[in-house]
Amino acid sequence: MAKPVVAIVGRPNVGKSTIFNRIVGERVSIVEDVPGVTRDRIYNSAEWLGKEFNIIDTGGIDLSDEPFLEQIRAQAEIAIDEADVIIFITNGREGVTDADEQVAKILYRSNKPIVLAINKVDNPEMRDQIYDFYSLGFGEPYPISGSHGLGLGDMLDAVRAHFPKEEEEEYPDETVKFSLIGRPNVGKSSILNALLGEDRVIVSDIAGTTRDAIDTTYTFDGQDYVMIDTAGMRKRGKVYESTEKYSVLRAMRAIERSDVVLVVINAEEGIREQDKRIAGYAHDAGRAIIIVVNKWDAINKDEKTINVWTEDIREQFQFLSYAPIVFVSAKTKQRLNNLFPLINQVSDNHSLRVQSSMLNDVISDAVAMNPSPMDKGKRLKIFYTTQVAVKPPTFVVFVNDPELMHFSYERFLENRIREAFPFDGTPIRVIARKRK
């Protein structure tokens, strides 16, 4: 089941990004005391009382050229569309403002759970000022201080109480679930339609015409699949495009439900920065990945074109060195018959468990071939290694001191594991732990 989504909404300069950073536990938003400074990373994962969720900072949209009320309305509408629960942030020092009331009117029509939080209540004497906020119509307000971390626990308790009840996954374990992600108009829906042989998803040449995620069940050569098509992710740009940044939340939900993610690239447009960001989301989530270059029929080619493209992809997607690449055309169905066997292969690799004895032999041989470097007179000593998880395959290396496990040596061990076992198409994790 996909994680619940929580959106932080409020007029500019009420402290949304400070609260966002407090909740996720790291400083990922740029925070200054100027309205509209939040940019770039506007969502993250968080956890409260053992429950994980995704959280959005709606201040991440750049609407500086738009009228003030349009900025507020766009933020609120994004939250309404994407979130399961909305945290409505106000400023206790300034009281209820006209802008707060405008936000409240929009949120009130949403029928989504709203938790009203009054920020910048930094001392007990200010608590008498919270009663005016009952007029916004969302019940008990929660006084908090983002800068000092006060009151956030009570607020998050209220948020967690509104999370949807967890449902059992509706598909059997042996069903392979995969999603297609990419920028708008790279041809995700066209690929899906071509695979199915029927128009199950409405396709248009206008970017962003596929809404939300669409599950399609399919059986091929006796294997059951669930295909999850997502709305495309548009690069940051004009005001009407800026809300498309939030389609990443739709993609994240699809990614979380998937075993395999097909990262679709438009051959006509080449590789864009947004392609790399999108692929990074799937990699960070630990999903098996296939890179699909679509619209291969639409470009001029010679006998070297595939090699040139492959080298370029490997250079620009260095973090996806494990991902196979397929050059296809949804229009002509070129190489589409390769996709299902490849999906099966990377799905199997994603859930592969290896024998502990074979694994430790591989690690011992690797250490003998390339001993770890010295650090301040100490050398990393590896005692044994065990696989602790699949999807993705995750290995814990028990050592004398995890601080001595340099990133480069961790990568070296990962490469040796990949050489020994069939992990094509899947990320693997190597974690150093101190032996007790």
UniProtKB/Swiss-Prot annotation:
GO molecular function terms noted in the UniProt entry: GTP binding; ribosome binding
Domain of life according to the entry: Bacteria
Biological processes per GO annotation: ribosome biogenesis
Coiled-coil blocks: none
Entries under Pfam families matching the protein: KH_dom-like, MMR_HSR1
Gene3D superfamilies according to UniProt: 3.30.300.20, P-loop containing nucleotide triphosphate hydrolases
SUPFAM superfamilies named among the record's database cross-references: P-loop containing nucleoside triphosphate hydrolases
Location of the KH-like domain: 352-436
Binding site for GTP 1: 10-17, 57-61, 119-122
Binding site for GTP 2: 182-189, 229-233, 294-297
Domain EngA-type G: 4-167, 176-351
Keywords per UniProt: GTP-binding, Nucleotide-binding, Repeat, Ribosome biogenesis
Family according to the record: Belongs to the TRAFAC class TrmE-Era-EngA-EngB-Septin-like GTPase superfamily. EngA (Der) GTPase family.
Protein role: GTPase that plays an essential role in the late steps of ribosome biogenesis.
Assembly description: Associates with the 50S ribosomal subunit.
Name assigned to this protein: GTPase Der
Organism taxonomic ancestry: Bacteria, Bacillati, Bacillota, Bacilli, Bacillales
